[in-house]
C-alpha cells in the first residue's frame, strides 16, 4: 500500500477566527509561510496564485472550499496545490490541501491539515512532508507570541535522518 496523504494536527492558543485569518490573509502568511502570500485574496471556486517576496510563483491552484469557522461549526479551506517554486515539482500533477479550523475549548483552536492526492506526485510528497511541520509550528508560534519561527532553508527543516 502506498501512502497518498500527509496528515497533521496541532492546537493553537488563539481563536478560530485568528487562525482562519493566518491561513487565508497574505499579511499573515508572508510572516510564517516562507514569505509566501496570495496575489489576490482567495475566493471559493476561483484560481489562486501565491508568490514569494521576490515575486516568483510559489503555488497555484483552485480554492475548492472556503467556509470560515462559526460558532458550533468548524471552518474549512480546501485548495488544489500545484507547486511552482521548483521546476521538478512543477511537472507533477496538482495535489490537494484541506485545512480544518475548529474551536477546541479552553482558548484553543484545533488545526488539522491534510495534504492529499499525492499518489502521482512522489517529489511533492517528499518535499512537503517536513515543510508542513515547520509551517504549522511557525504559524502557531506567530499567533501565540507575535513572532514566527526564524526563517530557514529547506535543508535546515529536514530531520537528521532525511539529510543523508
Q: Predicted regions: what is each one?
A:
Residues 19-20, 29, 48, 63, ...:
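Hydrophobic pocket/interface hotspot
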Residues 7-8, 18, 24-62, 71-74, ...:
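Short beta-edge strand/loop motif at the mouth of beta-sheet-based domains
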Residues 141-164:
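Short, highly charged C-terminal tails/helix-capping segments
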Residues 47-53, 78-84, 115:
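Short beta-strand segments that buttress and anchor functional surface loops
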Residues 1-16:
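Terminal, regulation- and interaction-focused segments at domain boundaries
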Residues 8-10, 60-65, 95-103:
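Hydrophobic/aromatic beta-strand elements that line small-molecule binding cavities or substrate pockets
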Residues 16-17, 64-75, 100-110:
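A short, structured loop/turn motif at beta-sheet edges
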Amino acid at each position: 500500500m502506498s501512502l497518498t496523504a500527509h496528515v497533521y494536527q496541532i492546537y493553537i492558543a488563539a481563536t478560530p477566527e485568528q487562525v482562519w485569518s493566518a491561513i487565508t490573509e497574505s499579511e499573515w502568511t508572508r510572516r510564517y509561510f516562507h514569505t509566501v502570500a496570495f496575489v489576490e485574496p482567495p475566493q471559493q471556486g476561483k484560481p489562486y496564485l501565491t508568490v514569494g517576496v521576490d515575486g516568483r510563483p510559489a503555488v497555484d491552484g483552485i480554492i475548492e472550499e472556503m467556509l470560515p469557522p462559526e460558532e458550533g461549526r468548524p471552518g474549512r479551506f480546501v485548495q488544489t496545490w500545484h507547486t511552482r517554486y521548483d521546476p521538478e515539482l512543477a511537472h507533477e500533477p496538482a495535489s490537494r490541501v484541506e485545512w480544518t479550523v475548529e474551536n477546541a475549548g479552553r482558548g484553543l483552536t484545533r488545526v488539522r491539515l491534510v495534504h492529499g492526492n499525492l499518489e502521482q506526485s512522489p517529489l511533492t510528497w517528499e518535499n512537503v512532508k517536513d515543510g508542513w511541520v515547520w509551517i504549522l509550528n511557525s504559524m502557531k508560534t506567530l499567533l501565540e507570541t507575535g513572532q514566527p519561527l526564524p526563517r530557514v532553508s529547506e535543508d535546515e527543516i529536514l530531520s537528521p535522518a532525511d539529510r543523508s
